[in-house]
Amino acid sequence: MLQKEVLNSKALNFKGLNLKGIEDTVLATIINKKVYDVESLKPNGERSAPLVSLEKALSNQDGRNFILECKRSSPTLGDFCKDFDLDKILACYENKASAISVLCEEHFFKGSIEFLKYVKARTTLPVICKDFIICKAQIDNAYIAGADAILLMLSVLTKDTYKELLNYAHQKGLDVLTEVDTYEDAIFAKELNLKIVGINNRDLRTLKVDLNNARSLAKLFSKDTLVVSESGIHTHNDLLSLKGIRNFLIGSSLTGSEDIEFQANTMLYGTNKVCGITTKDALQAVINNHAALAGFIFCEKSPRNLSVDKAKELSALAHGKIKTVGVFVDESIEKMVAIANDVGLDFLQLHGNETVQTIETLHKLLPQVKIIKAFNIEGPKDFEKLHDYEALCEYFILDSKSPGSGTSFDWGKIPANINKDKILLSGGIGLDNVEKALEYEFIGLDLNSKLETVKGIKDANKINKIFNIIHNY
C-alpha cells in the first residue's frame, strides 16, 4: 500500500498544483516523483497517427460504453498483472471497448508512454493517455505518441492551470477526460459545460472506494455531458447498480484476471448462457453477443442432442472466446468424463438427480472442469436443495420442471434471501419476458428454446435481439 507523504520542495514550488488537495496524501507521494519526471521531459518528433474522437465513441446510445484499461500495477494492488501481454489484452478489448485507456505513469503504476504507442499502432479505437498530467510537455508527449485523449485531474491541478491545460489539449485536437471526485470539483466541471467528465469512485487521497460517489455526483450533470464512472467496478451487478450512467472506465478487474476474456464477458455483460447450441452460425452469434457460456447437450431424448464429433467441431470454434458447457441428465460418470476430455469442455452441467458424491468424484477425475448443478423448480422445497451442493458447484441454474420446453416456473416464489451471486435464471426466457427475468438480478440468464424458430436450431436473429435487450437493461 502506498504511503502518504508531505510535498517536497520541488512540488511546493511547481506552478499550478492544487497544494491544498494534495498535501499529506498518497497523491503527494505520486506528485513528488512526477515533478522530477517532467523536468527532463523533452518531447520531439511529429505525430503520425490519425486522431480518433473519444467524444464520438462515448456518444453511442446502444448499450453501455466501456473504456477498458491497459494496467499492470497499482498502489493498492501492487503488481496484480503478472502476464502483461498487450496483444492478449487488445484481442479481448477490441470488440468490447469503445475506447482504450493506457496507464503511462511509471513509478507506482509501472506504465509507459511506450505502451501507448504500441496500443495505438494496433487499434482503431480512441486511446487515452492515463497519467498525472501537470504540464504542457506531457500533453505534447502524449500527442506525439498517438494519444487521442488525455486525463486531467481536478484533484491535482489548480482551476486556472486545469483550464490552461484543457485549452492546450483542445488546440491539438485532443479530447479531455476531466476527472472529479468531490462535489466542489463536480460543480466546477458542470459550470464549464465540459463534454466528458469522469467521476472517480476512489478517493485518491485515501485510496478508499465508494460507488455512491458516482451515483450522487452524476445527478449534477445534464444529459448532454458524457459522464464516466471510474474505479470500483468488480461485478456486472456493480454496473447495473449505477442506474443512469452509460460509460465506465474499467482496468484492474480485467487485466488482473487469469482469464481476461471470460472475466470481461461476465463482468461487462453478465454470466449469460445459451444452451442447446447445434450449429456454427448459432455459436458465432452467441460469441458475437458476448455470452459467457455455450451449452452443448448430450442427452438422446433432447432435440438438441449433439454427437461428440459435432461437439468437438463447435468446441474448436469456441476455444478462447467462450466457455463450453456439457449438459448431462443422470449420465454415468465414465461417459461424462470421456466426453469432457474428448471435447475439451470447461464445465459440466448436471441436470438430473446427481448426488453430492457424484460431483465429488467428478472433481477428482476432472480437476480442470467446473460443475454447474441445475434444479427443476416446482415448489419452495426445491430451493432448499441448493445448500447441499454449495461448496461443490461454480454455478447453479434454476429451471422449470420441463427443461427445454419453453415454460417458466413461478419466479415470484424465489426466496428473497437466496444467494444470487452464483445462480443463473432459466426456463422459458425469450423476447417476451427477458426484461422481467432481468429484474430478479441474478448473475445471468440461461437461454434455450425460445431462441429457436425451428426446433433444435437456434435463430441468430433472435439471439441478436435478446442480447440487445440484455445489454441495454
Language-model region placement:
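Active-site mouth loops of central-metabolism enzymes
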Residues: 67-85, 126-133, 177-179, 229, ...
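C-terminal helical cap(s) of enzyme catalytic domains, especially alpha/beta-barrels
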Residues: 211-221, 254-275, 308-318, 361, ...
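An N-cap/entry alpha-helix motif that binds or orients negatively charged groups
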Residues: 3, 8-81
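Glycine/Thr-rich beta-alpha phosphate-binding loop at enzyme active sites
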Residues: 72-83, 88-109, 189-218, 293, ...
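N-terminal active-site wall of soluble small-molecule enzyme domains
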Residues: 76-170, 174-177, 185-189, 214-217, ...
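Active-site/ligand-binding-proximal alpha/beta "capping" segment
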Residues: 194-273, 395-432, 443
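Glycine-rich phosphate-binding active-site loops on the catalytic face of alpha/beta enzymes
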Residues: 144-161, 198-208, 244-267, 291-303, ...
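Catalytic cores of alpha/beta
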Residues: 134-146, 182-192, 229-250, 278-289, ...
